[in-house]
Amino acid sequence: MKQLFQVEMVNESVNTLNKATKVLMIIHPKYLSDETLYMIDQWILKGGPTLIFLDPYAETEISRQQGVPPINPRSNLKKLLNTWGIDFDDKKAVLDAEYGFRISRNINGRDIQVTNYPWLNIRGDGLNQNESSLSNLSTIVMTTAGSFISNNDEIMLEPIITSSIKSGLGDAQKAGNPKGDPRDLLSDIKAKDQKHIVSGWIKSDLKTSFQNFKK
């Protein structure tokens, strides 16, 4: 990305943006202050282009203490999402019997070929063919991805990437366990013929989460 664009990294306590900002990318946010959330809120309400990446279980997150797993590998932007009418369960990961990768995993001392349901190889109908950003892609790989639901009839959430109908939601921490048996997750995949939105555009007018906020 830095080869094509001028990228400026900002820390989690920032409350103002560079005036030259064209696009705001919010990646795996946690513990953001109200001042920072207010800045994001106002940027979006003024029409600022924004890409938000949330993760129910960041497998590659680096722990602050070497050798100890991260205490909280989940993203959280609930204050804004709740106002917008978008639900993201930060404790649930998408499990997919159709798009799941076939892998070899050592289980009880034996190497076994299994479908790893949280590791998604999304293709075909899972990719919105009318979406220009996907025009040159035939497949997208995601691991322990979350899902988004619009629970507000006034908010349009247009799917970009979806699971297959042979999918469900399961415990993200259990799904992200590199030593676990993926077959134990199968009970969470129930035949509801329902796709889950893994990525989407919000194409509606949004309301502020800070009606009476004072800086």
Language model region names:
Residues M1-K215:
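Acidic, S/T/G-rich, low-cysteine, solvent-exposed domains in lumenal/extracellular/periplasmic regions
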